[in-house]
Swiss-Prot record:
May be a component of one of the vesicle trafficking pathways. May interact functionally with Ras2 protein. One of its GO terms (cellular component) is terminal bouton. It is a peripheral membrane protein. This is Protein ROP. The keyword Protein transport applies. It is found in: Cytoplasm, Cytosol; Membrane. One of its GO terms (molecular function) is SNARE binding. Keywords: Cytoplasm, Membrane, Protein transport, Transport. Belongs to the STXBP/unc-18/SEC1 family. It comes from the Eukaryota. The keyword Zinc does not apply. Pfam families: Sec1. It comes from Drosophila melanogaster.
Length: 597
């Protein structure tokens, strides 16, 4: 069952459809709609809003009596005859907002409050709430234990980009423990939602991973104490949660990727998953949400750009043939506006094909303008060999012309320098300064490279031993695209973890839990299904590998979760992080790291 569907069902059943008992006081009026349904307001904070937007549809929540969705941090009109459902994180800001709504007893914002915290409320905040004037208005107070954002069916985010600063910047050392507690609770709610009690392991080459792993284990134990069935069932004893720091692979977030999703988010101005394009001459701009409600996007997002346009065109031809719209030649396929005018009843489907043709074309335009020459150099740097497999002796010959090229952006120059520094395991200060001078980088741009040291990367060569790196698998074949030879390290890690080949010295299990990764119980087709309601999410009878990266997951790494799941079939791989990365976001995160205590 897809993560989004699972969370959507839980939000609908436990929050939106929640029906409080009627008020006992006489003379209290309520806002009743047609058919006697009582209208309510849904009040959310940032995470609550993103969860609702990602996992539910407005018409679904309206059908359950939600007339309005409001932001707790914005000014709102009082609706004192209506009850409000609050879906908020138990944070200082959100709890203060809740208290503020009822601080004036003569003019409360709403009639009563039904509060659903995303996770466990800290005792101090809970006490503040109990002592406040809002306490008498709170008729429901529950924890739903969903403190994460299902980004895709196998990808999750904690919606916490500040994790990068908190865990990698020396300036944030004083609040680090508190932040680790917070994200550990969020990760534990993911496991609880999935019904998993996984064996926890971590990359030992970064000190803070064990702190996070131990904190997650503590939270998992608390959930297990509340629900003994968590983690039970055939194969579930083999499920694992693997915690990685971002330093395990800083190459993948920096490379120009040529699969559709990664390429589009790197090269095009996609904001909040919204792609904007102009359908044709004298036509207004169109905005399209790239998400899993679009089956064509799901089909194409992990495909190499070389085949995307062809695939869209083939799909379109199949569609037009099936609807007997006549055979379309290639030119009219590209100008779908005429088809839409002729067949308005198929506007939705034809618009979808139009969107993806434009998306692929926009990506190819950027690629052909300048990205193609960057890709070859980046791939050679990452692999250490050229397209023929020959070891490259002098990378500088390829790098310097790009650094001197005024048409190449500073961001792209930083990417090239960072890749070079990493494959050399650090270079001299003198050589680094020369590269910066060639590229004419500002001090802020230079910080993006220098701050890789905060992630454990050797930037300036010294006597330090090179960090352990996972042994790479040979994957290049004749069918491999020359500009896409690199495979993210996480794919090797996922495969080795499932095959029980991951080095235990560098990826140990947390002590105190009996690992049973080789447990192969006979699988019952009925288990976890026969006793469930039809409306509930079905439980998969396979172990899960949940990979969490501290400090961002790239689009290419997200793709690996699907590839490994499809290849092994008897495991499901999920990957997630504090936030979702594009190369620009990763560089921006690096640039903002402060080294001051």
């Amino acid at each position: 069952m897809a993560l989004k569907v699972l969370v959507g069902q839980k939000l609908m059943n436990e929050v939106v459809k929640y029906k409080p008992p009627p008020p006992k006081k006489q003379g209290v009026t309520s806002a009743a709609g047609a058919g006697g349904m009582e209208w309510r307001v849904l009040v959310v904070d940032k995470l609550g809003m993103r969860m609702v937007s990602a996992c539910t549809k407005m018409h679904e929540i309206s059908a359950e009596g939600i007339t309005l969705v409001e932001d707790i941090n914005k000014k709102r009109e009082p609706l004192p005859t209506m009850d409000a459902i609050y879906l908020i994180t138990p944070s200082d800001e959100s709890v203060r907002g809740l208290i503020r709504d009822f601080e004036n007893p003569a003019r409360p914002m709403y009639r009563y409050a039904h509060v659903f915290f995303t996770e466990v409320c800290p005792e101090e905040l809970f006490n503040d709430l109990c002592k406040s004037c809002a306490a008498g208005k709170i008729k429901t107070l529950k924890e739903i234990n969903i403190a994460f954002l299902p980004y895709e069916c196998q990808v999750f985010s904690l919606d916490s980009p500040d994790t990068f600063q908190c865990l990698y910047s020396p300036a944030f050392a004083s609040i680090r423990s508190k932040h680790i507690e917070r994200i550990a609770e969020q990760i534990a709610t993911l496991c609880a939602t999935l019904g998993e009690y996984p064996n926890v392991r971590y990359r030992s080459d970064w000190d803070r991973n064990i702190d996070l792993a131990a904190s997650v284990q503590q939270k998992l134990d608390a959930y297990k104490a509340d629900d003994a069935t968590m983690g039970e069932g055939p194969e579930k004893a083999r499920s694992q949660l693997l915690i990685l720091d971002r330093g395990f692979d800083c190459v993948s977030p920096l490379l120009h990727e040529l699969t559709l999703q990664a390429m589009a988010y790197d090269l095009l101005p996609i904001v909040n998953d919204v792609y904007r394009y102009t359908p044709g001459p004298n036509q207004p701009d169109k905005e399209v949400l790239l998400d899993e409600n679009d089956d064509l996007w799901v089909e194409l997002r992990h495909e190499h750009i070389a085949v995307v346009s062809t695939q869209v065109t083939q799909n379109l031809k199949k569609f037009t043939d099936s609807k007997r719209m006549g055979s379309a030649d290639k030119s009219s396929m590209r100008d779908l506006s005429q088809m839409i005018k002729k067949m308005p009843q198929y506007q939705k489907e034809l618009s979808k094909y139009s969107t993806h043709l434009h998306l692929a074309e926009d990506c190819m335009k950027s690629y052909q303008n300048y990205v193609d020459k960057l890709c070859r150099v980046e791939q050679d740097l990452a692999m250490g060999t050229d397209a023929e497999g020959e070891k490259i002796k002098d990378h500088m010959r390829n790098i310097v012309p790009i650094l001197l090229d005024a048409n190449v952006s500073n961001y792209d120059k930083v990417r090239i320098i960072a890749l070079y520094v990493m494959i050399k395991n650090g270079i001299s200060e003198e050589n680094l300064t020369k590269l910066f001078t060639h590229a004419q980088l500002s001090p802020k741009d230079q910080d993006m490279v220098r701050n890789l040291s905060c992630l454990g990367i050797n930037v300036i060569a010294d006597s330090r031993k090179k960090q352990y790196s996972v042994p790479r698998k040979e994957r290049t074949t004749e069918s491999t695209y020359q500009m896409s030879r690199w495979t993210p390290v996480i794919k090797d890690i996922m495969e080795d973890c499932i095959e029980d080949k991951l080095d235990l010295r560098h990826f140990p299990f947390l002590e105190g839990r009996a690992q049973n990764t080789n447990y192969h119980a006979p699988t019952s087709a009925r288990y976890g299904h026969w006793h469930k309601d039809k409306g509930q999410a079905q439980v998969k009878n396979v172990p899960r590998l949940i990979v969490f990266i501290v400090g961002g997951v790239s689009m290419s790494e997200m793709r690996c979760a699907y590839e490994v799941t499809n290849a092994v079939r008897n495991w499901e791989v999920l990957v997630g992080s504090s936030h979702i990365l594009s190369p620009e976001i990763f560089l921006s995160d690096l640039g903002s790291l402060s080294k001051e205590d």
